[in-house]
């Protein structure tokens, strides 16, 4: 019985990862200074954005999301000209690795981050799916091992 429960939990978690792979959306918004809801910290989730003007969760064919920070030399938070834009990008880096780096975008020097995952461009740190799977699996594995040791 315990093994069946563990097996069902594993199948459920694998299906969650598969679902994440099928649907890729990105946040789309832009803020400048204190104007707009796109600035950091970005506190919205997939359901919140439906109520927030100027912020949307859009389907992204490439699966790659981006975040661009423009202005302020060192990108200081208190800079009036600091602009943050979140978007779907047509294609990610050539090596398919999530990353952030200084680059040129629309003829301006910016700090740009690329990530691949559903709504990944809203988070400060990229995808948390592997950590969530590990956190969920450890108690299940521990329970299963204890059951095996008792029998």
UniProtKB/Swiss-Prot annotation:
**Signal peptide start and end residues:** 1-19
Which keywords are on file for this protein?
Cell membrane, Disulfide bond, Glycoprotein, GPI-anchor, Lipoprotein, Membrane, Signal, Transmembrane, Transmembrane helix
The biological process GO terms on file are: chitin-based embryonic cuticle biosynthetic process; cuticle development; open tracheal system development; regulation of synaptic transmission, cholinergic; regulation of tube architecture, open tracheal system; regulation of tube diameter, open tracheal system; sleep
Q: How does it sit in the membrane?
A: Lipid-anchor; GPI-anchor
- Effect of a null allele: Larval lethal as larvae are unable to hatch. Larvae are hyperactive and occasionally change orientation in the egg case. Tissues that produce a chitin cuticle, such as the skull and the trachea, fail to form properly. Disorganization of chitin fibers in the cuticle and in the trachea. Elongated and convoluted tracheal dorsal trunk with tracheal lumen expansion defects in stage 14 to 16 embryos, possibly due to uncoordinated apical cell surface expansion. Detachment of the cuticle from the underlying epidermis allowing it to expand giving a bloated phenotype.
**Mind telling me which residues form the propeptide?**
122-151
Intervals, Cytoplasmic compartment: 147-151
At the top level, the lineage of the source is: Eukaryota
Lipid attachment in record (GPI-anchor amidated asparagine): 121
Pfam families assigned to the protein according to its UniProt record, in alphabetical order: QVR
User: Extracellular topology: which positions?
Assistant: 20-125
The record's similarity note reads: Belongs to the quiver family.
Q: What biological function has been recorded for the protein in this entry?
A: Required for chitin fiber assembly and organization involved in cuticle formation and tracheal development.
The protein here is known as UPAR/Ly6 domain-containing protein rtv
Origin species, per record, is Drosophila melanogaster (Fruit fly)
Report which gene this protein is encoded by.
rtv
């Amino acid at each position: 019985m315990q093994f069946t429960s563990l097996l069902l939990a594993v199948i459920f978690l694998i299906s969650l990862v598969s679902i994440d792979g099928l649907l890729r959306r990105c946040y789309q918004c832009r803020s400048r200074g204190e104007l707009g809801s796109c600035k950091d910290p970005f506190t919205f989730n997939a359901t919140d954005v439906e109520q927030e003007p100027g912020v949307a969760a859009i389907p992204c064919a490439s699966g790659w999301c981006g975040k661009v920070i423009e202005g302020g030399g060192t990108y200081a938070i208190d800079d009036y000209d600091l602009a943050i834009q979140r978007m779907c990008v047509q294609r990610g880096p050539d090596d398919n690795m999530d990353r952030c780096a200084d680059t040129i975008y629309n003829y301006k020097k910016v700090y740009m981050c690329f990530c691949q995952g559903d709504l990944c461009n809203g988070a400060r740190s990229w995808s948390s799916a592997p950590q969530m799977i590990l956190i969920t699996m450890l108690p299940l594995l521990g329970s299963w091992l204890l059951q095996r040791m008792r029998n």
